[in-house]
Amino acid sequence: MSGLECKNISKSYKDNKVLDNVSLNIEQGKIYGLIGRNGVGKTTLMSIMTGQNPADSGEVTYNGQPVWENAEALSHICFSREINTKSLLGMNNQKVKEYLRLASIYYKNWDKDMAEELVKRFGIDKKKKVCNLSKGMLSMLTVIIGLASKAEITILDEPAAGLDVIVREEFYKLIIDEQQENGRTFIISTHIIEEAANVFEEVIILKDKCVYLKENTVELLDKCRYVSGLEENVKNAVDGCKIINEEHIGRSYAVTVMQDGDCLLYTSPSPRDTERS
């Protein structure tokens, strides 16, 4: 069954190459996690996939049809991202009610009842201006648009970033329900690989301007270990291991590595633990 396909996508901003010859096939009816550190090119790739940002070279197709400048193909794809001063749907000084109305025009399969139910469930005041919403409410509004769009392929950029733990769990349950009941495809970007365990069927990791790996989540996590602590200690611990993701969290350094042979892995003390000793 056809889906969304990227072929040899490259993109640079002035002299900074962000994506280099990226090829990727997204099958229909799956939940994908797009993982990589901040600044690795996740948002750039997603915006190219949805025709919002032209690539320097390569092509994107949906069911064999070009996505760029193709309204029919794009009508099956929703890219819902953090709302900025000026967003896809207009100025964010509009009230939530008007913002949702504009979304209903843009997405042909818009589910008004779902949007209304989710707005009530998450306590969003429709009379409030979008620009006056908290970060958590902005994230939830982004999620609502993605879900209520009913697009066959729905792409969400760091949707859980502003959500607390309870709401985040409810969000992921909604995603899983939509995929199981309606066969929708979701691509969800995050820099937190631990979120993959119970949600994503496949994980795509961007690193060094390209797709570093694409693998079944269960199989990948069986091979991986998460190591965190003082940067020097962590680097010594994983020396010689295949690092698939890394991030700095305050003064701590965390990496996800592939278990490889006799590579010794351990979690070193955090800076706070070190200060206490």
What do the PLM-derived regions correspond to, one by one?
Residues 32-37:
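The feature captures the beta-strand-to-loop junction immediately N-terminal to the Walker
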Residues 50:
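Helix-to-loop junction immediately C-terminal to a conserved catalytic motif
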Residues 58-69:
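Conserved ABC transporter NBD signature motif
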Residues 72-75, 81-142:
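ABC-family P-loop ATPase nucleotide-binding domains
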Residues 154-158:
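Catalytic Walker B motif of ABC-type/P-loop ATPase nucleotide-binding domains
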Residues 171-187, 191-257:
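ABC transporter nucleotide-binding domain
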Residues 266-273:
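Conserved small/polar residues in nucleotide/adenosyl-binding loops
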